[in-house]
């Protein structure tokens, strides 16, 4: 087997006789040949070929590796026909570092000799490995562990040589590539596209042609890789990835150069056969309408949503109409709806607690009483009822203030503040009559008559309600002064309170009956459940008893079968023992008759036979007893 370590390195001839000569070595001459063969790197056709630099660079590195080995055709064939992409990428990384290291300035004679040996050994390893699926240039495995170790040693020597030559500067190889080949490639592209002079192109800086953010990301990526190499050491993979990053640098110029081309085309339009007009043209005078400014139309939007108006100029709030208009159709409405309409029309004059009180009363009172209350509510004096406070200065409510406590006690009245509230028993007190309501103004007789008739209607409705409900009711004092009829708030409050108490009693009565019926239903349900449960238990007991009987029957049958089997086995054993005993008896008889003298001399044997006989006999007796017991069972 061919040993890779003993491979003879190819000879690289030097034109100079000393290591300090400035002549190019054969390695560098091969690099020059590769440069001359790839003319596209010097004069690219268009800006669109900038992204081809990385591909060209990789191909150039592979060509250098294959041509330096002396077995270019064999290596190229193996590499091209291999299907192991992982192994091919490892070889490409090795060639990138090798090419960049040879391209460095100041490479001395000893370093070049070391590179020659590295190239020779690496090439022989590729030929021996064949770059198959289990290649040593791929992941480690038990099959390729020897070649894999050789490959790691060669790569380690190349990385160590790169570290020595660059004095530990991790980005030195990439920076050399950026300043030489990448810079020349970019300037040649600019020269070909923009048609600039060589002096102008030479004065350009790469940082001026690259987007600032792109250049910042480019530098940050390389610095991060430098930190990785400094912390974990030089390696072929890390060095090669930095070189690949530098190789894609021309792609950062794509957008910038395209913008420059567009600016040039816009500033210098190409017109076939037409001369370019001079920039300073004479003024031809004012242009009609030049100073007129076209006003842009203002767009206003308008959205109408639930009686609200939103406009980009005006904001209109909801409009409330506080006026009240008589409508004869209101008489056909229900008392509750009439009250709600009244509250909505007089929302600014009635306080919230007062409106809630009217709604509560009209909702709980019977229809006849609510009609009467609603009639008073529709009267124009309602606002005065809820908002008026008696004052001695105008004479209104003076009768209430002058009422003595003795009169209140005599009339069985309750006092809430300064307004009296008379409470009488419906069974002992005659119905209310409006005759007690008088007017203090003789000039308003018509108004007094209408008020009296209205009071009469209220009294009749309340008396009708008292006759239907056997309970205490309220009787209200109506005061008529200056033609206005007042309905005290205490009347409405006490009326609603009374009706509420009646409804509470009715609800409690209904609840009592409902509770009694519910208890009866619960008792019936318990009885039904109890009977159903007992029936189910009896059925379960019957089924269980039948199952037990069946189980006992089956168990007894199984027991009988087992006992019969035991009996048969015991019977067989007993017969066998009987045969043994008979043989022992025969043997003993023969011994006794044939040779008595010998038996006397063999007392020990006879005694032993007797013991065996007794033991067998005891066993037979025991088995006989067992058989008898089994027969009895």
Swiss-Prot record:
Effect of inactivating the gene: Cells are still able to induce low levels of internalization, but are impaired in their ability to enter epithelial cells.
Keyword terms, alphabetized: Actin-binding, Plasmid, Secreted, Virulence
Entries under Gene3D superfamilies matching the protein: SipA N-terminal domain-like
Compositional bias of kind Low complexity: 438-455
Subcellular compartments: Secreted
Major site of localization recorded for this protein: secreted
Induction: Synthesis of this immunogen is repressed at 30 degrees Celsius and restored at 37 degrees Celsius.
GO molecular function, one term: actin binding
Xref: Pfam families: SipA (PF09052), SipA_VBS (PF17985)
Gene Ontology BP annotations: positive regulation of actin filament depolymerization
Region Disordered: start-end pairs: 267-294, 321-348, 388-455
An annotated GO cellular component: extracellular region
Database matches in SUPFAM superfamilies: SipA N-terminal domain-like
Taxonomic superkingdom: Bacteria
Stretches with biased composition (Polar residues): 330-348, 400-415
Family note: Belongs to the SipA/IpaA family.
Function comment: Rapidly associates with the first 265 amino acids of vinculin after bacteria-cell contact. This interaction is critical for efficient Shigella uptake. IpaA acts as a potent activator of vinculin and increase its ability to interact with F-actin. The complex IpaA-vinculin induces F-actin depolymerization along with the occasional formation of actin filament bundles.
Subunit description: The association of the vinculin-IpaA complex with actin occurs via the F-actin binding domain located on the tail of vinculin.
UniProt name for this protein: Invasin IpaA
Primary gene name: ipaA
């Amino acid at each position: 087997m061919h040993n890779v370590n003993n491979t003879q390195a190819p000879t690289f001839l030097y034109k100079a006789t000393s290591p300090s000569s400035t002549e190019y070595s054969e390695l560098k001459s091969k690099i020059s040949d590769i440069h001359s063969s790839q003319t596209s790197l010097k004069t690219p056709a268009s800006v669109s070929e900038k992204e081809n630099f990385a591909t060209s660079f990789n191909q150039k590195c592979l060509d250098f590796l294959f041509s330096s080995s002396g077995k270019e055709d064999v290596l190229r064939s193996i590499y091209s026909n291999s299907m192991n992409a992982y192994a091919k990428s490892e070889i490409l990384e090795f060639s990138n570092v090798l090419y960049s290291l040879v391209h460095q300035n100041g490479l001395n004679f000893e370093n070049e000799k070391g590179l020659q040996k590295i190239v020779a050994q690496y090439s022989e390893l590729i030929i021996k490995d064949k770059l198959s699926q289990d290649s040593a240039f791929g992941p480690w495995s038990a099959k390729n562990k020897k070649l894999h170790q050789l490959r790691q040693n060669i790569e380690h020597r190349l990385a160590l040589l790169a570290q020595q030559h660059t004095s530990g500067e991790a980005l030195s190889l990439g920076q050399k590539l950026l300043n030489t080949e990448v810079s020349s490639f970019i300037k040649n592209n600019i020269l070909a596209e923009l048609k600039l002079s060589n002096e102008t192109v030479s004065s350009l800086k790469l940082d001026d042609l690259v987007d600032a953010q792109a250049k910042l990301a480019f530098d940050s990526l390389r610095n991060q890789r430098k930190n990785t190499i400094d912390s974990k050491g030089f390696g072929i993979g890390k060095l090669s990835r930095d070189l690949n990053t530098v190789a894609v640098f021309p792609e950062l110029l794509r957008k910038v150069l395209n913008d420059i081309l567009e600016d040039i085309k816009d500033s210098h339009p190409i017109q076939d056969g037409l001369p370019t007009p001079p920039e300073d043209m004479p003024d031809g005078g004012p242009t009609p309408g030049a100073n007129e400014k076209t006003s842009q139309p203002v767009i206003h939007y308008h959205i109408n949503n639930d009686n609200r108006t939103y406009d980009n100029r005006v904001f209109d709030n909801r409009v409330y109409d506080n006026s009240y208009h008589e409508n004869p159709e209101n008489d056909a409405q229900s008392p509750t709806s009439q009250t709600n309409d009244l509250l909505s029309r007089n929302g600014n004059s009635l306080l919230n607690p007062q409106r809630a009180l009217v709604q509560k009363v009209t909702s709980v009172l019977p229809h006849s009483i609510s009609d009467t209350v609603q009639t008073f509510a529709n009267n124009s004096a309602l606002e005065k009822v809820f908002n008026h406070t008696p004052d001695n200065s105008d004479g209104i409510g003076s009768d209430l203030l002058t009422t003595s406590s003795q009169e209140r006690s005599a009339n069985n009245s309750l006092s809430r503040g300064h307004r009296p509230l008379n409470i009488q028993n419906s069974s002992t007190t005659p119905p209310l009559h409006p005759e007690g309501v008088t007017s203090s103004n003789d000039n308003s007789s018509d108004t007094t008559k209408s008020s009296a008739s209205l009071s009469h209607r209220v009294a009749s409705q309340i008396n009708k309600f008292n006759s239907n409900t056997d309970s205490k009711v309220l009787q209200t004092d109506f005061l008529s002064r200056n033609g206005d009829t007042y309905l005290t708030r205490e009347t409405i409050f006490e009326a609603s309170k009374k009706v509420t108490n009646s409804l509470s009693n009715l609800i409690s009565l209904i609840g009592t009956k409902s509770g009694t019926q519910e208890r009866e239903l619960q008792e019936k349900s318990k009885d039904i459940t109890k009977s159903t449960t007992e029936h189910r238990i009896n059925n379960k007991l019957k089924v269980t008893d039948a199952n037990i009987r069946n189980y006992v029957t089956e168990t007894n049958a199984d027991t009988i079968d087992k006992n019969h089997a035991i009996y048969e086995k015991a019977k067989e054993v007993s017969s066998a023992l009987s045969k043994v005993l008979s043989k022992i008896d025969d043997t003993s008889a023969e011994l006794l008759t044939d040779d008595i003298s010998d038996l006397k001399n063999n007392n020990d044997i006879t005694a032993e036979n007797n013991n065996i006989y007794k033991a067998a006999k005891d066993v037979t007796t025991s088995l006989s007893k067992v058989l008898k017991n089994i027969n009895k069972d």
